[in-house]
Amino acid sequence: MQSKPQLLTWITCDGVHIDPGSGKHTLLGVFSNIQARQFPVTHPFMVWFLTISDCSPGQHRIRISLGLDPTALQPLLERPFDSASPLHRINLINEIRNLSFPQAGDYSLLIEIDDEPILATSITVSG
């Protein structure tokens, strides 16, 4: 029986530095909400950093969707990634550019791997 991929880490930040010598990841400017003076607002750049385990060997697909209405989420990002073994921890650095928020609110966010939800959460955008 194949296990479901597990999300070990989900962090929103300003950037990720990867040390060329050690391969260690340093997360810069971690945040959990967005504040704006007026709406609509466009956030110029952020990184969604994920660590995933229990992925069977081979190619997989991650999709991240977002929206104010949790029943009508729009895909923001969809891309492939590879897994060598279910024992490996896979760090995925997802750069999000020019993300628009039409109004303040709690925006629902859904992360799926191979069309299977692994996290449903929200990000608060306030004025």
Feature locations, PLM:
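Contiguous segments within soluble domain cores/interaction surfaces
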Residues: 2-127
